[in-house]
Amino acid sequence: MKNLFLLYAFLIFTCSCSDDANAQNNKDIFTIYLVRHSEKDLSANNLSDPPLTLCGVQRSENLSDFLKDVHLNIIYTTDYLRTKSTAFPTANSKGLEIELYDAQQLKDFSQLLIDRQQDALVVGHSNTTGVLAGLLTGEDIGAFDLDIYDRVYQVVIYKNKGRLHLLHVSVDCNE
């Protein structure tokens, strides 16, 4: 029930932002959603690029459901199986291709996101997602703990100034 309330509040806010015809026509407003990849399988043979756990797959599908009514122009991930697998259900449901970005070049990537002025989903890592949100908003936001997977950073950019909304989306894992 709590998740449903958060979703409705989120959708109301998103819709109220997109109803401003003047802002939409001028491309002055757009929204970037940043998430960390879902749970990775640390028991996998390839520890440098492990797949998602069953819970991670569920979380990724839940993210797609969460973003079902949200307009997206583009989806970005790093070049790892776990980030691409997290983004895949959303990309598939929206008919979008996944574009790769370099997590070692966050400052340049943040500027690209601002310059492109597109509604986007960015899937990253615990040490990049908060940092990127900070670059987009001018705030000092660092990395977060490795056991945190429920954060969605919603950054609304209006006239090149970002405003951050931190959302928490929990998943009841059936693993």
Label every PLM stretch briefly:
Residues 6-11:
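Hydrophobic helical h-region of N-terminal Sec-dependent signal peptides
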Residues 13-16:
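C-terminal motif of bacterial Sec signal peptides marking the signal peptidase cleavage site
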Residues 125:
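Conserved alpha/beta-hydrolase "nucleophile elbow" surrounding the catalytic nucleophile
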